[in-house]
Amino acid sequence: MDETEWIHRHPKAEDLRVGLISWAGTYLTFEACKNTVTATAKSLGRRQTWEILVSNEHETQAVVRLKSVQGLYLLCECDGTVCYGRPRTSHHGCFLLRFHRNSKWTLQCLISGRYLESNGKDVFCTSHVLSAYHMWTPRPALHVHVILYSPIHRCYARADPTMGRIWVDAAVPCLEECGFLLHFRDGCYHLETSTHHFLSHVDRLFSQPSSQTAFHMQVRPGGLVALCDGEGGMLYPQGTHLLLGMGCNPMRGEEWFILQHCPTWVSLRSKTGRFISVIYDGEVRAASERLNRMSLFQFECDSESPTVQLRSANGYYLSQRRHRAVMADGHPLESDTFFRMHWNCGRIILQSCRGRFLGIAPNSLLMANVILPGPNEEFGILFANRSFLVLRGRYGYVGSSSGHDLIQCNQDQPDRIHLLPCRPGIYHFQAQGGSFWSITSFGTFRPWGKFALNFCIELQGSNLLTVLAPNGFYMRADQSGTLLADSEDITRECIWEF
């Protein structure tokens, strides 16, 4: 079977949310208990996150509503006060959003014509005359592990560590080199590659963030972003090989990228240690002893459902076909492409929509033959496009803090957790300094252990996972800010975005 053209998926709604930073460096915040809106928060959390709902958009402006994660809207009242709730009329809560050249936004109430502003604490809408106090800096609220897709060239950005360059030439974002960490510091963005180098204003990668790696970001509703140096230079693909570099003359909107959460690509191994791979004519076999491009599958899963779709690098989905064979020829909405997943100590068991479990036949074909699963129906699963994790929970990112010796779960800036595979589904967690994660008798963690411990990872969604710690409990985010492993059951505080 020939490959189909890789179809880029639009960002999910949660990837399109933003935080809005006032001139004072504080975030627009809805106060759930007071029904008020303030701008006192110093970091981006759930209450500082807004979904931009567009009803009409032009090149430099759009008519929008701002919706909180609770489902309520930012509202401007006749007396200039700002609150949140449900709109009473068709224009109540509507703002004219203008995009400014300095990467700022202004929000003008559609009814009164007044601008949304803050004094660094309170938020109100009283002035008709535009000033610097009305400027808001949008910050994308999606997870910091991202990919960049060029809708003009229909390719993804890819870092080349051997040449120290970034190219926009990847048709399928299945490689670790397509993932980047988007750091936000002092109002600017730093783009870090998977090998921990930074994109710069000049034609090479830097080993450390600096003023030469700091970019301003223009943000548009719908996930579109453009990176610039603040002095007229824009970042866009150049030349026949589409080298990502700084220039002043992008053509046809080449400077715009769709910013998305880095997808999850995995490999599956049979009991015999062979990789599940797509072979000639869409056949799927456990035939390869080495990992290759056709052994990679995008893990697509709705967190509300225990079913998963596995999208191969040829653009098709694994699907159960006649004679119970599994083929890589499915399409997104076909019921036969959905498999129910079961977990056993980090190994995955897949059940077809017709009830039978996937296993390896004597001729090495992947088949949906078995009614009662056994070891032959368990597959080892390994991350294929990431050698590290960045975990975000209910209260923020997992990371270290200068004020604590324990690992925290409420940080604005995350730490990388380097993954050292032990066996399928089981990893050692290594801190950024090279030492290992250790666990105390209280179920807390420190980042300077001498010995490697086993952590069991199980996927719960497209970019969601749980971690079973060495003490036998699930790792969870605690409201105090301390990372704990003390949960016998999987609760919402045990679910981690990665």
Swiss-Prot record:
Q: Where in the cell is it found?
A: Cytoplasm, Cytoskeleton
Hey, what tissues is this thing expressed in? Expressed in testis.
Molecular-function annotations in GO = actin filament binding; protein-macromolecule adaptor activity
Keywords carried by this UniProt record: Actin-binding, Cytoplasm, Cytoskeleton
| Keyword Transcription tagged | no
Q: List the disulfide bonds.
A: none
> Listed GO cellular component terms?
actin cytoskeleton; cell projection membrane; cytoplasm; cytoskeleton; filopodium; growth cone; lamellipodium; microvillus
| Highest taxon of source | Eukaryota
Q: A Pfam family matched by this chain, by name?
A: Fascin
Q: Which residues cross the membrane?
A: none
- GO BP annotations listed: actin filament bundle assembly; cell migration; establishment or maintenance of cell polarity
Functional note: Acts as an actin bundling protein.
Regarding protein family, the annotation reads:
Belongs to the fascin family.
Q: What is this protein called?
A: Fascin-3
Q: What is the lineage of its organism?
A: Eukaryota, Metazoa, Chordata, Craniata, Vertebrata
Give the encoding gene's name.
Answer: FSCN3
